Amino acid sequence: MKYRKLIILVLSILIILPVSTLDGHHIANADDDPPKKLKYKENSALALNYHRVRKANFLNNFIYFFSSSKEIKNYSVSQSQFESQIKWLKSHDAKFLTLKEFLYYKKKGKFPKRSVWINFDDMDETIYENAYPILKKYKIPATGFIITGHVGEENFHNLDMISKKELKEMYKTGLWEFETHTHDMHNLSKNNKSKLMKASEATIIKDLNKSEKYLTKNFKKSQKTIAYPYGLMNDDKLPVIKKAGLKYGFSLEEKAVTPNSNDYYIPRILISDDAFEHLIKRWDGFHEKD
């Protein structure tokens, strides 16, 4: 009877998940085609973006294997996968950068070989529970892009968000920097247009100023960067992003970063297990000689 109930629960989840994942939470780079090999340029760096790090247990693994949900397949890795990826990067002499270092080298015009910058969007509880301990174990720096108006909120688009107390614990390790993912503009309309893209100039500036104040108050000075909700931005909104005082913007795109990458369209590679296998492991930067 116990196992029968478990099977019914799992099947129910599989039916629900494909149509309820985060209210259409992510759409950038969410196609079903396998990733292609990254084009290699000698002076470049990899910005690796994560969203969810799942606990590696039977139920989660079962759901992952059988589900057609893009949220699960494209926007999450298991805890064991995440640690395996970090260990692979270390074994291939990746130079892990803080955000501050990443921006410094970009501005300077020269990245160290095998430069890697680890970052996370949304900052839900799975990052604190499953990614943070691994990064702390290996002393790897990371950046979290926070939806500052929803810190600690339960059931935000089906996610339990990380708490302020947990963020401060992470910050005190010296390994974490926190930047804005907007204050309260992480929503999609019915036509898959983000709230940020539809809002007026005054509304956007007010939102980003609130987020900046939160970050400055709790985590000292930020680097004046934003990870766009859903990785989406267009040119007609850039003037207001600049007017709000932001100096860099991050999208989601399967490209390495070069010094010439547009400061407001800096590409980050969305990491899933498949993306790491096809894109990161095959990147020529990890296979060239010093």
UniProtKB/Swiss-Prot annotation:
<feature type="signal peptide">
    <location>
        <begin position="1"/>
        <end position="28"/>
    </location>
</feature>
<dbReference type="InterPro" id="IPR002509">
    <property type="entry name" value="NODB_dom"/>
</dbReference>
<comment type="similarity">
    <text>Belongs to the polysaccharide deacetylase family.</text>
</comment>
<comment type="function">
    <text>Catalyzes the N-deacetylation of poly-beta-1,6-N-acetyl-D-glucosamine (PNAG, also referred to as PIA), a biofilm adhesin polysaccharide. N-deacetylation is crucial for attachment of the polysaccharide to the bacterial cell surface; it leads to the introduction of positive charges in the otherwise neutral PIA polymer, allowing electrostatic interactions.</text>
</comment>
<dbReference type="InterPro" id="IPR011330">
    <property type="entry name" value="Glyco_hydro/deAcase_b/a-brl"/>
</dbReference>
<dbReference type="GO" id="GO:0016811">
    <property type="term" value="F:hydrolase activity, acting on carbon-nitrogen (but not peptide) bonds, in linear amides"/>
</dbReference>
<dbReference type="InterPro" id="IPR023872">
    <property type="entry name" value="PNAG_deacetylase"/>
</dbReference>
<dbReference type="GO" id="GO:0005975">
    <property type="term" value="P:carbohydrate metabolic process"/>
</dbReference>
<dbReference type="InterPro" id="IPR051398">
    <property type="entry name" value="Polysacch_Deacetylase"/>
</dbReference>
<keyword id="KW-0134">Cell wall</keyword>
<keyword id="KW-0378">Hydrolase</keyword>
<dbReference type="GO" id="GO:0005576">
    <property type="term" value="C:extracellular region"/>
</dbReference>
<keyword id="KW-0732">Signal</keyword>
<dbReference type="Pfam" id="PF01522">
    <property type="entry name" value="Polysacc_deac_1"/>
</dbReference>
<keyword id="KW-0964">Secreted</keyword>
<feature type="domain" description="NodB homology">
    <location>
        <begin position="114"/>
        <end position="290"/>
    </location>
</feature>
<protein>
    <recommendedName>
        <fullName>Poly-beta-1,6-N-acetyl-D-glucosamine N-deacetylase</fullName>
        <ecNumber>3.5.1.-</ecNumber>
    </recommendedName>
</protein>
